[in-house]
């Protein structure tokens, strides 16, 4: 590769952004996430040829939350023809908060994209129709992608989310009223919350997502994860819709396809080169990791990387 990387570079980047800790806010609308220590900070890289770099709390597991929406879309792509998926969910950025009901009502129950809550719930509804055990299947996929056999769900987080699920339930029932939700709402919500409650580290996330940097192929697996076209499509969706309503700001500052979660994680893709995962639990007003975005900005400037 035409760039030099070592752990010391990542350590330097973390030191530069560490002063931001204390300026964001840990997600508190999910009680099980509110207790996470806000000072955590980690970063990891996995290259398409299997090299690994890390710094900070890169090996500590956390709740990946909405990062899982990429994985559920990947599973759906492996079980449904393309036209069936995109009849039920769009490909456009929302520009609204990730749990908005207003836009969904105006657009007759068709979510703008699979990375807002409504879109991810439709994808989970589709998986319920094709998989006998959707939660177990997700674990199998993630463990294979990551090469780690003990990745599991945080039952406390999943239960906490289900106990505070009124808004997501409203989203699901609204889509059901428009005929775009076919299965039992509580069952699908449980699957959705378990996906969000996957516990993974930065290093595990970088390794899991490196297939998106390598035209759908993971260096340690014999079979492609998705086709090259599907990998490009997923990266495009991440670029336009992966950072909630701040996708444009993120494109301006960082310039990579990425997906964030309110657990403080972000996964970013440098096509043909690497997957990057960062974690810092304190969030900005849009629900993205404050120090995590700054770390990615520093890294892309250091490496001279952008898809634009």
UniProtKB/Swiss-Prot annotation:
UniProt GO MF annotations: glutaminase activity
Reaction equations catalysed: L-glutamine + H2O = L-glutamate + NH4(+)
SUPFAM superfamilies documented for this protein: beta-lactamase/transpeptidase-like
Gene Ontology biological-process entries: glutamate biosynthetic process; glutamine catabolic process
EC number of this enzyme: 3.5.1.2
Pfam family, one: Glutaminase
InterPro entries per record: Beta-lactam/transpept-like, Glutaminase
Swiss-Prot/TrEMBL keywords: Hydrolase
Binding annotation for substrate: 66, 117, 161, 168, 192, 244, 262
Record's subunit section: Homotetramer.
PANTHER family assigned: GLUTAMINASE
Family: Belongs to the glutaminase family.
Name assigned to this protein: Glutaminase
Organism: Salmonella enteritidis PT4 (strain P125109)
Gene name for this UniProt entry: glsA
């Amino acid at each position: 590769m035409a760039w030099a990387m070592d752990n010391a570079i990542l350590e330097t980047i973390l030191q530069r952004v560490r002063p931001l800790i204390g300026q964001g806010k840990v997600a508190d609308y999910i009680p099980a996430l509110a207790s996470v220590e806000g000072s955590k900070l980690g970063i990891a890289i996995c290259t398409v040829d299997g090299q690994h770099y890390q710094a900070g709390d890169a090996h500590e597991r956390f709740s990946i939350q909405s990062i899982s929406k990429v994985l559920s879309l990947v599973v759906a792509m492996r079980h449904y023809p393309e036209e069936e998926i995109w009849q039920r969910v769009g490909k456009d950025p929302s520009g609204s908060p990730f749990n908005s009901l207003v836009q969904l009502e105006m657009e007759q129950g068709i979510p703008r994209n699979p990375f807002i809550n409504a879109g991810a719930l439709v994808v989970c509804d589709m998986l319920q129709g094709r998989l006998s055990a959707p939660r177990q299947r997700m674990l199998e996929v993630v463990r294979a992608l990551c090469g780690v056999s003990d990745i599991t769900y945080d039952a406390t987080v999943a239960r906490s989310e289900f106990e505070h699920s009124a808004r997501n339930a409203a989203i699901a029932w609204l889509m059901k009223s428009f005929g775009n939700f076919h299965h039992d709402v509580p069952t699908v919500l449980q699957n959705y919350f378990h996906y969000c409650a996957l516990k993974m580290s930065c290093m595990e996330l970088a390794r899991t997502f490196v297939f998106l940097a390598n035209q759908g192929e993971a260096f340690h697996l014999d079979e492609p994860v998705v086709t090259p076209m599907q990998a490009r499509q997923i990266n495009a969706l991440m670029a336009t819709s992966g950072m909630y309503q701040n996708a444009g700001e993120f494109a301006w500052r960082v310039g990579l396809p990425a997906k964030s979660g309110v657990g403080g994680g972000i996964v970013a893709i440098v096509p043909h080169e690497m997957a990057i995962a960062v974690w810092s639990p304190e969030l900005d007003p849009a629900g993205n990791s404050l120090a995590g975005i700054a770390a990615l900005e520093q890294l892309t400037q250091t490496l001279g990387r952008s898809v634009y």
